Amino acid sequence: MRSLISVAVLSALPTAFSQANTSYTDYNVEANPDLFPLCLQHLNASFPDCASGPLSLTPVCDRSLSPKDRATALVSLFTFDELVNNTGNTGLGVSRLGLPNYQVWGEALHGVGRANFVESGNFSWATSFPMPITMMAALNKTLIHQIGTIVSTQLRAFSNAGLGGVDVYSPNINTFRHPVWGRGQETPGEDAFLTSVYGYEYITALQGGVDPETLKIIATAKHYAGYDIESWNNHSRLGNDMQITQQELSEYYTPPFIVASRDAKVRSVMCSYNAVNGVPSCANKFFLQTLLRDTFEFSEDGYVSGDCGAVYNVWNPHGYASNEAAASADSILAGTDIDCGTSYQWHSEDAFEDSLVSRSDIERGVIRLYSNLVQAGYFDGEDAPYRDITWDDVLSTDAWNIAYEAAVEGIVLLKNDETLPLSKDIKSVAVIGPWANVTEELQGNYFGPAPYLISPLTGFRDSGLDVHYALGTNLTSHSTSGFEEALTAAKQADAIIFAGGIDNTIEAEAMDRENITWPGNQLDLISKLSELGKPLVVLQMGGGQVDSSSLKDNDNVNALIWGGYPGQSGGHALADIITGKRAPAGRLVTTQYPAEYAEVFPAIDMNLRPNETSGNPGQTYMWYTGTPVYEFGHGLFYTTFEESTETTDAGSFNIQTVLTTPHSGYEHAQQKTLLNFTATVKNTGERESDYTALVYVNTTAGPAPYPKKWVVGFDRLGGLEPGDSQTLTVPVTVESVARTDEQGNRVLYPGSYELALNNERSVVVKFELKGEEAVILSWPEDTTSDFVSSIDGGLDRKQDVIA
């Protein structure tokens, strides 16, 4: 018998299993999944009644039992149809038991993003913070944690009001490898260490700590793994098969997921659309069991959710399975517990009837989901922790103004000839360009309604300056019809602010950029404005970098600022930086490459190391052999700083001694601090400013080739007045100085190492590792990349399922 959910929807919806091959969408090219309404549905959320409802006499309501035992008891009560109905992100619940439906799909990338917002009044908005790419540029761990804490509080308020669940598909902890990637804006940048720390802080803030007794919000680390291309050159994310060496999987693509699982104790992980080395991520037992659970220590009770439609994609377009039922079976057995989509709900019964999966196989994932809902207090009534959070808490946390602080701290000053901050003699400004008067664009993507959105134009008007506004040109326009109005406005002002760059019409989910140049004729208009002989400040907005070399080289462009996606208070933050009310201290967390970088080798080449044969010049700041326009870690101040240290030689450390010394407070010896990088930072200029620090390591220990350097720590010092000094102390962990061999093992190699402060290397501290090399993470052998599915009777991995 077809499951109840199928009976309910078959008459209303087209189904994949009823379509002929000729009607299939070619998802090798199309990057947007065609999700059924059931998957996309917003539900009226409610909590189970454990006081007097049918569930009240069942073990799921017994708080003396463990979350897993409670969940197991609940799922054991389901009929087979009821079980299947709760395998998708839109779970139908079980009405006869009083178990309400539940929507797993929530969003909290930089604020509450997918709740059931009402039209006006209470619960019509939530705080909209800067995008993660801008957050991370602040280099402030405390700020990231604050934001995550506020977001989790606001999520709980919506949940308690019946407007959302207690889990989210956030954060995105993929690394921003290639500059054309449309979703790089959602990430903390191109560095795996920074991404790992960001993930740790955001996850533990969302969840209410490291493995708390009661989960505040269930976080989901996504997209696991090797996912960083949307649609480049018609290579769809839904069908991409990314070829990645075990060395670089271990070294670059998975460390954020190790930290999320082992250290932050994240309770959910999302497997990605793409395949890696021939195996779709959601059907990859090596990824989901051998690595994630056995090696990365992801909780046995944590659940894996497929990206939305990714289980279906195991069949179409990957061709790894012969049909959608086999794709469901492959994914269930590999370890994908919940299907964001409808494949499990519509086809796991077929898989069961064909003896591809057992009831217990299907139960495992549903038990894991409900185990986490139990731990989040979902079944524990109004006296459960966090159930007292209300709309008043949304109002109070928004009033903390952290969205403004995050925008200010994430702004990066790329170029300045002392034009900034603007002189007090400047009384009027012309605000020109396609980003000048935007509002919603400030939010990037995955956002909900904000309480307000302050455009750059409004920000300058609120600063007290006399403002002249002209659009000038649109982002992608080649028309010069607005140039004259822009030039007229500029001539009337003492200084010119051009706000442009890119936005989510150019970089987005399912849409990579074709190039990394400034789109349209924005540079032409900037060039004409630069000929007027007035102070000219350019705001480069958007998540991904564009080649601003012409602006860097133009002496008449006096200052250049990267603002990213600064959120609801972005306009005030930008204006306050430019007028000098606040001082910039952000640093780029991506490399700004010259335009030709995006043209000389395929964006789907996942190899970081340079390769003359393929034309790959090396990817990320660690391996790039060319000259960037602006380096990763670049960022200027309004003041000057002097950095010094008492010693430039930290001595030597015996590897075996380090690893065998007791490590109280750490689960593994490699997590402990090897040494503290310490420097005195003095403000030698005339303006108060924060100071940001990146600490790099470099070495020729271990296998060649050698990365130029890599990040091992960072910090932000606040509010240094002129003449003041502060001590910078950055812990450097044992595992952060390890390298990766060709098999993927993380190894401590004996040899000489240097720690350097920022790109300028203003402080350099040497140390030496002695003794025998030692493996601190053994990378298991991947036996699945050449795996031929026994479920499918030995079919080839990549079938031609598209007509």
Swiss-Prot record:
Residues 1-18 form the signal peptide. Keywords: Carbohydrate metabolism, Glycoprotein, Glycosidase, Hydrolase, Polysaccharide degradation, Secreted, Signal, Xylan degradation. This is Exo-1,4-beta-xylosidase xlnD. It catalyses: Hydrolysis of (1->4)-beta-D-xylans, to remove successive D-xylose residues from the non-reducing termini. Optimum pH is 5.1. Xylan 1,4-beta-xylosidase involved in the hydrolysis of xylan, a major structural heterogeneous polysaccharide found in plant biomass representing the second most abundant polysaccharide in the biosphere, after cellulose. The active site is at D307. Belongs to the glycosyl hydrolase 3 family. Its main location: secreted. Pathway: Glycan degradation; xylan degradation. It is found in: Secreted. GO terms for cellular component: extracellular region. Its EC number is 3.2.1.37. The lineage of its organism: Eukaryota, Fungi, Dikarya, Ascomycota, Pezizomycotina. Glycans are attached at N21, N44, N85, N122, N140, N234, N437, N474, N515, N611, N676, N698. The keyword Secreted applies. GO terms for biological process: arabinan catabolic process; xylan catabolic process. PANTHER family: EXO-1,4-BETA-XYLOSIDASE XLND, SUGAR HYDROLASE-RELATED. Optimum temperature is 52 degrees Celsius. It is an enzyme of class 3 (hydrolase). GO terms for molecular function: alpha-L-arabinofuranosidase activity; xylan 1,4-beta-xylosidase activity. The keyword Hydrolase applies.
